[in-house]
Amino acid sequence: MKAAYLDCFSGISGDMLLGALVDAGLDFNLLQRDLAGLDLDEYELYEQKVLKQGIRGTQIHVHALEGHVHRHLSDIQAIIGRSALPPQVKEKSLEIFTRLGKAEAKIHGTDIEQIHFHEVGAVDAIVDIVGAVIGFWRLGIEKVFASPIHVGKGFVKAAHGLLPVPAPATLELLTGVPIYAQDVEGELATPPGAAIVTAYCREFGPFPKIRVERVGYGAGVKDLTIPNLLRLTVGELADEDKGQEGIREGEALTLEVNIDDMNPECYDYLFEKLFQAGAMDVYIQTIQMKKNRPAVLLTVQTPYHKLEEMRRILFQETTTIGLRVYPIKKYMLPYELLTVETNYGSAKVKVAFMEGRACTVSPEYEDCRRLARLTGEPLKQIYEEIKEKAKILLYSTKYPMD
């Protein structure tokens, strides 16, 4: 499972989170293209590499072409609702703005529909929040953890005058979240940052056990006595004990295409491109279409954030003029790859677990084929020996076979 850890040693804000996502690998041009779906032309977006206490980070700037446009929650809901953003991005963005609205309404003692957003309703906050949701979606992050949040101290100037730090709306949003303040003056955690982190994160504490793949630093505007950075670590969640881990549940998309007029020789290249682009599975089935024409049903399973690329490949590399897309639920056993040594050489074996026991042992085909070609021995013989060696290895560990 792809996970992220937010290290909030200098607080969290929407622009810092967006900068951290870009620094961790979110394509900035793709982000701009996605945000264009909001149909807002009152801002310019650019990135800048900066140093904070000697640490390089990415700073995101949202330059408003007009003054602050104050909006009600219903205005923001309308902008997001009519946008060209993916449904899951719309849903999460609306959830975050609703959280903000409820917090502001409680602080001001009024109804959420009467709340008149100030900075939160400005274009920079909209871009920061929707951009962060796009970033988590594009990077395929399924679970988010965070450290206790450094909120700062003192007072901050707002539309209503001087407010204590953390601002009342921020503190309301962080109810139940571990926070702290040290000798750093100023507002470190903002309402948009608090709304985003509490919408995604349910666990606040030390670093989880994660196989690190990417690290990004998002820079704040101010120069502080500590590095004004938000650190984002992205990687695969490493379970304490794969043998005890439960069945994983996930979501994906299925793309289907009916094809009756394509050269069958092209499918090999098509499969290769789809898998290289990140498809989870690709297969074809023989079907009978109208006028009794033989055809194939091409099916592609993909993560949500790969939809655009899969769609482009299918339209580019096949003869279809249309495709079907629908969401699916996936249930998967946890597994790990073992390396076993045989008389023929080393090979990898995929071992799946259920309720603390190894239940499936599958030698990797490519390794078996390589050893068969290398030794001249029958493929099936090599396959069986590798499988037996893997079982012996499992018997000698804490993962017995069923």
Swiss-Prot record:
Q: What class of enzyme is it?
A: lyase
Reactions performed catalytically:
Ni(II)-pyridinium-3,5-bisthiocarboxylate mononucleotide = pyridinium-3,5-bisthiocarboxylate mononucleotide + Ni(2+)
GO MF annotations in UniProt: lyase activity; nickel cation binding
Keyword Calcium part of the UniProt annotation? no
Gene Ontology biological process terms, A to Z: protein maturation
TM ranges are none
The enzyme's E.C. designation: 4.99.1.12
Give a yes or no for keyword Lyase in this entry.
yes
Question: Keywords, A to Z?
Answer: Lyase, Nickel
Q: Which InterPro entries match?
A: Ni_insertion (IPR002822)
Q: Which family does it belong to?
A: Belongs to the LarC family.
- What the protein does? Involved in the biosynthesis of a nickel-pincer cofactor ((SCS)Ni(II) pincer complex). Binds Ni(2+), and functions in nickel delivery to pyridinium-3,5-bisthiocarboxylic acid mononucleotide (P2TMN), to form the mature cofactor. Is thus probably required for the activation of nickel-pincer cofactor-dependent enzymes.
Q: What is this protein called?
A: Pyridinium-3,5-bisthiocarboxylic acid mononucleotide nickel insertion protein
Q: What species was this sequence derived from?
A: Desulfitobacterium hafniense (strain Y51)
